[in-house]
Swiss-Prot record:
Pathway: Nucleoside biosynthesis; alpha-ribazole biosynthesis; alpha-ribazole from 5,6-dimethylbenzimidazole: step 1/2. Belongs to the CobT family. Catalyzes the synthesis of alpha-ribazole-5'-phosphate from nicotinate mononucleotide (NAMN) and 5,6-dimethylbenzimidazole (DMB). One of its GO terms (biological process) is cobalamin biosynthetic process. Its EC number is 2.4.2.21. InterPro entries: Nict_dMeBzImd_PRibTrfase, Nict_dMeBzImd_PRibTrfase_bact, Nict_dMeBzImd_PRibTrfase_N, Nict_dMeBzImd_PRibTrfase_sf. Keywords: Cobalamin biosynthesis, Glycosyltransferase, Transferase. This is Nicotinate-nucleotide--dimethylbenzimidazole phosphoribosyltransferase. SUPFAM superfamilies: Nicotinate mononucleotide:5,6-dimethylbenzimidazole phosphoribosyltransferase (CobT). The gene is cobT.
Length: 338
């Protein structure tokens, strides 16, 4: 679907009339769940997940058949500051790896039965160094938001967004600090594996960006423009498109959560259609999830990004939906006690 906005004002307007969860589907799913051949509440959180999914899909007996994993790749000007353990050219190399089917995300998509798309966002033209100037112009931000919006398959019934971009945990840390408050050190982690003096340098970069753009940080979209990256903006655009289309979303790690947090800062209901697939080993991720009110499904010590933790969670949600829709009721099974 072509993005319905050509400016940041147009993107903001999207959030003025967001669709709501289908209350009738929630009621039907809840009623069905109460009659299934199990003790009430015996499936724990799976029951809540299934009912949540039913409400956003709009079907009291839903199916999960067409999950989409949308990966966005962008390069960052701050990568030249040595904030990552890897050089900027790795972004392009990893995109080639995705297309060849050789990355972890490819294997996890196959196991989860998910389609995978990869959107490259001007990889030959990094964002600007946000310690010197805003990372993006307004037009560049709008283009990235639109690219994310248009990458969502209207036929999908679940969306996971992932990212590739050397330097993007630095941008995510800056976004989180700007939106949530606190110091650069509280939000800056090891990312690709930096430690010691390299981590100190990364933290200084975040602090410098926050100081330079202090006057702009009261506006979530200005936070994204000044401190973010094209792939982070595209993830926000994709999550917004899913919200408008009532497509459920599983959020991934710290970078994805920072993108989602921009939407949450615009209006908290912007993430009603989203759950957190996991909590990552990136140190600030638990705090970021708490700030947007999301409880993770998994804690596996993962810190790869690229949507991987959320993809692992797809089959948990699929299991929940299968139980709600596939189990027999007490009456159907002829079992006493219902």
């Amino acid at each position: 679907m072509k993005a319905p906005f050509t400016s940041l004002a147009g993107f903001r307007a999207v959030f003025e009339t967001l669709p709501q969860v289908d209350a009738e589907a929630v009621e039907a799913a809840t009623a069905r769940n109460e009659t299934l051949t199990k003790p009430k509440g015996a499936l724990g959180r799976l029951e809540d997940l299934a009912i949540w999914y039913a409400g956003w899909i709009g079907d009291g007996r839903p199916a999960l058949e067409r999950p989409q994993v949308a990966i966005f790749a962008g390069n960052h000007g701050i990568a030249a500051r040595g904030v990552s353990a890897f050089p900027p050219e790795v972004t392009v190399q990893m995109v080639a790896n995705y297309r060849a089917g050789g990355a972890a995300v490819n294997q996890l998509c196959r196991v989860a039965g998910a389609s995978m798309t990869v959107t490259e966002l001007e990889l030959d033209r990094p964002t600007l160094d946000f310690t010197v100037s805003p990372a993006m112009t307004e037009d560049e931000l709008v283009a990235a938001l639109a690219a994310g919006w248009e990458a969502v398959d209207d036929e999908s019934d679940l969306l996971v967004v992932g990212e590739m971009g050397i330097g993007n945990t630095t941008a995510a840390a800056a976004i989180a600090a700007a939106l949530f408050g606190g110091t650069a050190a509280e939000w800056t982690g090891r990312g690709s594996g930096v430690a010691g003096s390299a981590l100190e340098a990364k933290t200084r970069v975040v602090a410098e960006g926050l100081e330079l753009h202090a006057d702009a940080l009261s506006d979530p979209l200005e936070v994204l423009r000044c401190l973010g990256g094209r792939e982070i903006a595209a993830m926000a655009g994709a999550i917004a498109r899913a919200r408008v289309g009532r497509t459920p979303v599983i959020l991934d790690g710290f970078i994805c959560t920072s993108a989602a947090a921009v939407l949450h800062a615009l209006t908290p209901s912007a993430l009603d259609h989203a759950i957190a697939g996991h909590v990552s080993a990136e140190g600030a991720h638990p705090a970021a999830l708490a700030r947007i009110g999301k409880e993770p499904l998994l804690d596996l010590g993962m810190r790869l990004g690229e949507g991987t933790g959320a993809i692992v969670a797809i089959n948990i949600l699929r299991s929940a939906v299968a139980c709600l829709s596939g189990m027999a009721t007490f009456a159907e099974a002829g079992v006493s006690g219902g």
